[in-house]
UniProtKB/Swiss-Prot annotation:
SUPFAM superfamilies: Homeodomain-like
Organism per entry: Arabidopsis thaliana (Mouse-ear cress)
Name used for this protein in its record: Myb family transcription factor PHL13
Domain HTH myb-type, chain residue ranges per copy: 235-295
Sequence ranges of Polar residues compositional bias: 395-434
PROSITE patterns recorded: HTH_MYB
Gene Ontology CC terms, in alphabetical order: nucleus
Any GO BP: regulation of DNA-templated transcription
Record flagged with keyword Coiled coil: yes
Main subcellular location of this protein, as a coarse class: nucleus
DNA-binding stretch(es), residue numbering of this chain: 266-291
Molecular-function annotations in GO: DNA binding; DNA-binding transcription factor activity
Protein family: Belongs to the MYB-CC family.
Pfam short name (any one): Myb_CC_LHEQLE
């Protein structure tokens, strides 16, 4: 690829290839041969844009780039180090013939919209290169990278004046096979100078920042003295003071006079003590310590008691748990026993009920048998007591024996009746005679 010298890349842009010597141009006057005989393609021309070659040392690339992105009619050998530039091409169909790296001849039909490709007549037919010309073609001198870089260096202004930016961009897009020569890039002193300049500038900027920070940095040991100096009164008021037993007794008396440590205030205690060198801060701190010391044993007792209670409760809970577990197990055992007994009783009751039902059935069967036997007996007695008679005869009655007895007893009854009538007559006769006698006496 060809880039400007400002970017540190060795490059040269030329439209006439002045770098090559004249003897190569003389040996190959007809590097591109034009054929006007093929006019069948003139009806459907395919536009193909032609760009000048860019010489970049030993690198090479495609020459043509069409509007569609490809130009199938052009083949360029990458082994050749220099090629003549193509300015314009006529509308006729042309054939570009050249020799590749292996010495093979290639024909490339190209159609363009320019006026002239090279100063040759259109009647000239396709020409081939001779072996003598090909021999001299490969006799190029070995290029020196340093000499080539020093020889082909061009300033940025000249590059911009000779080549416009759109053409250069299109050329970069079309030159797919162009690759940068990294050895030349690394060996270029301009690139190294550029990087050294950038490094020096960055180091200068870093130094300036460090100096600025050092100027504005403040010593941490001096910060409290520079920020705010505490007043002398606070320093004197916060001086430590040793509480003597006398002061403590006066302090306790003042607190008792004020109604206890909860109601006492540091200012009131200070007024009651009236000791020199004693401040409100001393009284306040001592009062706080007194309150905490007073409530500590109570709190400790209160805390010990709940701990003991908690321990007792835990032990009680454990014992209760054991007792309850034992009781629960015993209750479960009793319940199991009761359930077993109930189950046994239910089985006994069921067996008794079954036995009672069987006995009832047996009694019923016995009663039925007795009834049947009685009926059979009655039938047999009735059949044996009844004589055989005519069907017209009345049925025998059970009252006949009684009638027979009555007939047998009839004479006795008649006799009794006769005797009764005789007795009646005798009584009547006697009564009549008695009545006659009474009448006579009257």
């Amino acid at each position: 690829m060809t880039l400007a010298s400002d970017f540190g890349f060795p490059s040269a842009i030329s439209s006439s290839f002045t770098i090559l010597e004249e003897r190569y141009h003389n040996n190959f006057p007809n590097t591109l041969c034009v054929s006007s005989g093929q006019e069948s393609m003139n009806n459907n021309p395919v536009p193909c844009q032609v760009f000048p070659l860019v010489s970049g040392g030993s690198s090479g690339g495609n020459l043509f780039s069409s509007s569609s992105g490809f130009c199938n009619g052009v083949y360029v050998s990458s082994s050749s180090q220099a090629r003549p530039s193509v300015s314009t091409v006529p509308r006729d169909r042309i054939t570009v013939a050249h020799v590749s790296g292996e010495g093979q001849r290639q024909e490339c039909p190209v159609e363009t919209h320019s006026l002239q490709l090279i100063n040759q007549p259109q009647e000239q037919k396709i020409m081939t290169w001779s072996s003598d010309q090909i021999r001299g073609f490969f006799d190029f001198p070995v290029p020196d990278p340093q000499a080539a870089s020093s020889r082909t260096m061009v300033s940025s202004k000249e590059v911009l004046s000779k080549c416009e930016w759109p053409d250069w961009a299109d050329q970069l897009i079309s030159d797919d096979s162009l690759e940068p020569n990294w050895s030349e890039l690394l060996g270029d002193p301009n690139v190294l100078n550029l990087y050294s300049k950038i490094e020096t500038q960055s180091s200068d900027i870093a130094r300036q920042e460090i100096v600025f920070r050092n100027q504005h940095q403040v010593d941490p040991s001096m910060e409290p003295f520079n920020a705010k100096s505490p007043p002398a009164s606070s320093m004197t008021s916060k001086q430590r003071m040793r509480w003597t037993p006398e002061l403590h007794e006066a302090f306790v008396e003042a607190i008792n006079q004020l109604g206890g440590s909860e109601r006492a205030t540091p200012k009131a205690v200070l007024k009651l003590i009236n000791s020199p060198g004693l401040t409100v801060y001393h009284v306040k701190s001592h009062l706080q310590k007194y309150r905490t010391a007073r409530y500590k044993p109570e709190l400790s007792k209160d805390t010990e008691e709940p701990l003991v209670k908690n321990l007792k409760t835990i032990e009680d809970i454990k014992s209760l748990d054991l007792k309850t577990s034992i009781e629960i197990t015993e209750a479960l055992r009793l319940q199991m026993k009761v359930q077993k007994q109930l189950h046994e009783q239910l089985e006994i009751q069921r067996s008794l009920q079954l036995q009672i039902e069987e006995q009832g059935r047996y009694l019923q069967m016995m009663i039925e048998k007795q009834q049947k036997m009685q009926e059979n007996k009655k039938d047999s007695t009735s059949s044996s007591s009844m004589p055989e008679a005519d069907p017209s005869a009345p049925s025998p009655n059970l009252s006949q024996p009684f009638l027979h007895k009555a007939t047998n007893s009839e004479p006795s009854i008649t006799q009794k009746l006769q005797n009764g009538s005789s007795t009646m007559d005798q009584s009547e006769s006697t009564s009549g005679t008695s009545n006659r006698k009474r009448v006579r006496e009257d």
